[in-house]
Amino acid sequence: MSESGTLTNKESDTKILSVLVSDPQKQKTHSQTYITYQVSTKIDGKDEPNCVVRRYNDFVLLHQILINDHPALLVPPLPDKKVLNYLSGDRFSHSFTQKRCRSLQTFMRRLLSHSELSKSRILETFLTSTDWDVYRRSLTGQISTSEVSDVLINAFKHVNRQRDEFVEIKEKSEKLDHNLSHLDKLFHKSVKRVDLIGQNLKKLQSSLSGLQELCCDEKELSNSIKAFNDGTMQLIDSLNDLNKYVDYEYNVDIKDMINYIEALKQLIRLKDQKQIDYEELSEYLTRSINEKNNLLSGYGSGNYFKSKLEELAGINQEMARRDKIAKLETRVQSLTDEVEKSKQVADEFEKEVLKEVEQFEQIKTLELKDSLAALAQKHIDFYDDMVEKWSKIEERLESA
Amino acid sequence: MNVFDGSDEEDNNPFSGTTHLYASGIAAVTDGPDDYDFTEPSINGSSDENAQSNAVAEPIEETDEPAEEIDDDTLQTWRFASAELSRSSAFETSYTNLLGQGKNPEVIRIVDAGQYRDIYGKYAIGYKIEFGGIVVTRRYSEFDSLRQSLCRLLPTIIIPPIPSKHPIIKYLFNPLHAKKDIKIIERRQRLLSRFLNNCHKVREIRNHIVFQKFLNPEYFWKEVLNTPPISILPMNNLLAPPLNPTKPSPIHLLLPTPTVLTMRKHEQLIGRNDVMEIKFADYDSDLIRYKAILQPLNKTVRSIRSNIQTYSAVLSELGAYFNAFSLENSVFQVSALFEQMNRLSMGIEKTGQAIDVNYVSAEIFSEAIMISLEEGSKEMLQFIHEAQRVLHFRNFKQEQFYTIETTIKKRKDRIRELKEADLQAVRLGEALKLNAEESPTVAQVMDSMTRKSANKNHTDKQIMGLFRSSASPNNKSGSDSISSEVEPHLLTKDERVVQVNKLEKELEKLNECFKLIEKDLQQVNESMDNSLNNLEKYFHEKWFLIFRELAHNITSWLKDCSESWKNAKQSIDSI
């Protein structure tokens, strides 16, 4: 129970260095089947990584708590639920769990790279504590997920005035999204093609084996065919590995990046929401003040008929007017306060979001760098390995 | 040579009415048909017939004007410059010089392909062939007719293949156009050049006058097609000397003409345990096995190539999007990250460049696969098809051989039967004579028998005459007419004598045929064995070449890609 010790002592500053999500395992209980992932955390000052086992729903819970606790922060998104895969029963397939594992890993890394979220206590519990199970049981179903409807309501309202930065951010994130989704599509296509090429090469290989059998009297030729075929075999295998990497990891990274941008957009929409609140309030305030001023300056409120009607009804116009002015007075008073408050909230939020955008940029840059570097490295490894092998084969064939 | 003596027909020249060299009788042709060096005047006599038969064979060419009427200005200058002035000239010397270089893989090159104006002023796609410094332009249809002619001139030789014809329907809607169909023309250029070099490697083709004339700009190809030896090719190569079908040989015309229906089964022939037979049966089955491997291989290679092409198209798009991505990869300019983000842009751009390099080298690689493996295996398949055609010719020759052999056996049996019957009749006659001395009844029967036979003899003469004319020498196999099937003891003595005489005469001719076909078969075997052996060697060399080329291309593709990714990595690492 040493973990719970660190939990209670929050100031002890357990510095988390890195997190690894790995080893998806299929679990079967009497009522359900699910996949668990091993989450191992390297903590400063400890040699052994700290390992816990979590399932996707645990990640969902963590995510939900973080969003509710930090509405103004950019909480990294989780991979989609992929309802279709659930329906088709594909969610236990190797490729599905591998890809999800990769996404969860990215999620954890983003949390840890975030200056605020990485300090969150709930994250620490999630990573290190055996108490998490208790947490989950008591919290599941209790957390509201209301923000979605808010966003929907205001989907057609637009902010009137906004800072230039946000105009830029919105525009650019659209473009980035656009580029990335094209990359995603193209990588998918290329993965499919390479897969086909691999299958074709296998067929070629078997044809050549047939040829080798036919030419077995010709020692040299048969040796050449064998050399070539061996090389083809290795090419197929390595190509397959490389393709798997692109499919399972690089492509997932792109997808996750797209989701991250989506989360950022969501956050900006939330900011817009606050702005809209403020703008609506201040508009209301202006209207009230105008009305009050009109009354004060003696120009009849409303039209002639209305005043006539009121006169007939025996209402003292002068009295009513004063009454109204007094009401407006208090309304203006309270509205002024409200506007002040909402402006503060909106400004605060805006500042917060700008900071978040900066953080996003930082995390994104690092992430892109890492995934590009890994992509390049995988390719270099593949090509170098193949160059070495095929140079030898070429030599063998030349000497034949 | 007097096979026809004793026959009552006056003109049994089978060549009459054809364009054969012997059309006007054997005497009309001087000896020495071994060399094809016919001079032009020698064909003047039959040129009218040639013109007619060619008009039938090539109706398309009919509209063309004769070469002589063409204005010199319309001729391609580089083709016919001073050609007519010196017809013997430089070509022959350079050709003979180059003959020694048969080993050199690329003696003949097609240096250019494209639209040109042929001698009739028509536009066509021409292939500029360069051989020993001499250039000649030929069209695809001319290559095609060269090949067809070679197939007929050298029935025992495997003639190298040419690229298949453009599908006729495609051609109707969309004729080959120099600018539009660069790919097809390039491909043809490559494959036709391969064809010429493959031909040049084969001694029989290399030394053949028709092939030499094809490479010689001094000859109009149409003219070559209308002159010997092509114009005097026999209708049926089975009735001509196999190594040299245009060489006159009347006995060949006596050979039977087997059809596919009368062909013996292979197994029957192998049953004879002939060494050659077994060897050729092996060739046959090897070819079939080879084909069974090459066909799916060719298909697979085609789909590899097209998949790599699609893949490279995806890569090119991917490269473009990485480029766009490098310009628009941030949502907000953070001053603190300015430097880093610039570098990120660089890194992404370099990655895009690496992908671009991958795209280009994949394109090159797919081209290399197409040229070496796809076209190579296709060529081999065509070669196998050719080899099977040649083997088929041999089967027919073989069938001729067996037909004659069995016919001789039948005739001999018949003669023996007849002679035995004779002896028996003598014995029977003697026995009867003895009996007749004792019994008048027997004597009476004998008397009527001799009278009957005398009558029969008379009618038989008519039958015999009919038989003679109907059983003309060239269908020996069908000459078992009714009278020869009759039980020998039912014939009279005279009839038997006549038949024996006739059969012996036939046998004489048959034996001559047998000697001939035996020699033919030996020649066919030898020549084909050689040709098939060469093919096998050629295949082996081709495979070595293909594997070497492929391995080389794979390595350079891998190297290029590796290099480009290393460049990208450097830039990424500096982020």
From Swiss-Prot, chain A:
Q: Where in the cell is it found?
A: Cytoplasm, Cytosol; Preautophagosomal structure membrane; Endosome membrane
| One Gene Ontology MF term | phosphatidylinositol-3-phosphate binding
Q: What's written under domain?
A: The PX domain binds phosphatidylinositol 3-phosphate which is necessary for peripheral membrane localization to the perivacuolar punctate structures.
Amino-acid positions noted as binding a 1,2-diacyl-sn-glycero-3-phospho-(1D-myo-inositol-3-phosphate) in the UniProt annotation, renumbered to this chain: R55, K81, R100
State the family named in the UniProt similarity comment for this chain: Belongs to the sorting nexin family.
Q: In UniProt terms, what function does this protein have? A: Sorting nexin, involved in the separation or division of vacuoles throughout the entire life cycle of the cells. Involved in retrieval of late-Golgi SNAREs from post-Golgi endosomes to the trans-Golgi network, for cytoplasm to vacuole transport (Cvt), and autophagy of large cargos including mitophagy, pexophagy and glycophagy.
Q: Which GO terms describe its cellular component?
A: cytosol; early endosome; endosome membrane; phagophore assembly site membrane
Tell me the organism.
Kluyveromyces lactis (strain ATCC 8585 / CBS 2359 / DSM 70799 / NBRC 1267 / NRRL Y-1140 / WM37) (Yeast)
Q: Which gene encodes it?
A: SNX4
Q: How does it sit in the membrane?
A: Peripheral membrane protein
Know the name of this protein? Sorting nexin-4
PROSITE patterns, alphabetized: PX
Q: Ranges for the PX domain? A: 15-134
The record, for InterPro entries, names: AH/BAR_dom_sf, PX_dom, PX_dom_sf
From Swiss-Prot, chain B:
PROSITE patterns registered for this protein in UniProt: PX (PS50195)
Quote a single Gene Ontology cellular component term: cytosol
Q: What is its main location?
A: membrane
* Domain annotation PX: ranges: 101-221
In Pfam terms, one family for this protein is PX
Gene3D superfamilies in the cross-refs? Arfaptin homology (AH) domain/BAR domain, Phox-like domain
Highest rank taxon of the organism = Eukaryota
Q: Which InterPro entries match?
A: AH/BAR_dom_sf (IPR027267), PX_dom (IPR001683), PX_dom_sf (IPR036871), PX_Snx41/Atg20 (IPR044106), Sorting_Nexin_Autophagy (IPR051079)
Q: What does the record list as GO biological process?
A: autophagy; protein transport; retrograde transport, endosome to Golgi
Q: What is this entry's stated membrane topology?
A: Peripheral membrane protein
Q: Where does the UniProt annotation locate this protein? A: Endosome membrane; Endomembrane system
Bias regions of kind Polar residues — which residues? 41-55, 469-484
List of residues binding a 1,2-diacyl-sn-glycero-3-phospho-(1D-myo-inositol-3-phosphate): R139, S141, K165, R188
| Family classification | Belongs to the sorting nexin family.
Its domain description in UniProt is: The PX domain binds phosphatidylinositol 3-phosphate which is necessary for peripheral membrane localization to the perivacuolar punctate structures.
Function according to Swiss-Prot or TrEMBL: May be required for cytoplasm to vacuole transport (Cvt) and pexophagy.
Q: What is this protein called?
A: Sorting nexin-41
Identify the taxonomic lineage of the organism of origin: Eukaryota, Fungi, Dikarya, Ascomycota, Saccharomycotina
Instruction: Name the gene for this chain.
Output: SNX41
